[in-house]
Amino acid sequence: MRTFASTAPKDSFINVLNLRSSLSIWKNFCQPSENIPKELSRVSVKICRTVFTSEVVVWYMPPSWVQRNPQPRTIIEAAQLAIQVTDIGEVRHFMPHSQIPLIVHQTWSHRQIDTWPDDLRQSVEKWLQFVVEDEMAYFLWEDEGMVEFIDHFEPQAHDYYSSLPLMVEKTDYFRITVATCVGGIYGDLDTVPLKPPAQWITSQDVRPWTDLETRSVYNSMKPVRALFGIEADCLPTDHTCWRMGYPYSIQLTQWSFASARDYPLLHQYIENLAHQLQKIANHHGGLQTSAARTELQALDPLTLTGPEAVTRAAQEWLNTSAGLRWNALTGLHDGGKAKLVDDVLILPITSFSPGRGKYGNMGSKPITDPTALVHHHGQGS
């Protein structure tokens, strides 16, 4: 059931999706098409005929997830159902070798897809193809839907969320929050999955590995509970990372990542941000004062909420939980291998940042490489 949330009556669904004849995303997923298997076409038709009203946002729940449960009427009910279904712990609801649920989250300001650039529509189409084929849940969160989610699942965070001056910062914060509360896979709308998320973790990825400098061996037998890719992979001694604008020699992506619900590393990110915002609030008598807003506007989003903030949280958590030497994660000396640290899987740069050019390549292989999983069109944010 894909739901196009709207305050309008169900009949308006045809108006909302009157774009099907011109937009391949809806052509492929809302009517039979010779370009996709008949089995997928039949499922897609069923999806698009099942419509419920809601205030915001769009979602899809596999039929097998709702067979024994009341049909969700709102995005919040759908998220609660996703939590309920995956809490049962059936293996088919999770990525292999992990406790990460097969739930995809994406964000965008609105669902007027006729105004979206072609590349965004094509990216979402690819995500939806894998979602339907592998019986995954899918959520597209609009701006209003993000506020609704925060107010329902994390009401104590409303002031922090609303104080962030830029929408990109709110989106950064939301992706971590929704992964914390629901779990799943996050992908920016301008990311294209090159492989289905159900195939992202292989038995090769969770094998033991050795820190080549300290000779420490990491041989965790735990299921993966968080998964991140590398955005920057530089030798800490040659200052390449600084020349390219990266404060960390090993910096993680946050245009795509995956996590089990309620994972401590994500809590570390949230606590770091809350501490920084509370410090500003204490200094200026609240977060809504003009002085507080001025200070917040002067902060770099990449540092406050973006990949630098994610990297900092991961570095702190993995140092505490596993004593990790951060630069041991480099793939420059082993051809780019995945590394499991405790229950966090760090994928090489090619996985989420393949196809980089000669400058700033950092070991990135072509998008055709078997380890390439996601292609980010906004690469280098």
Regions found by a protein language model. Give the residues of each.
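Small-residue hinge/turn detector
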Residues: 173-184
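Glycosyltransferase-associated regions of secretory-pathway enzymes
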Residues: 1-171, 187-381
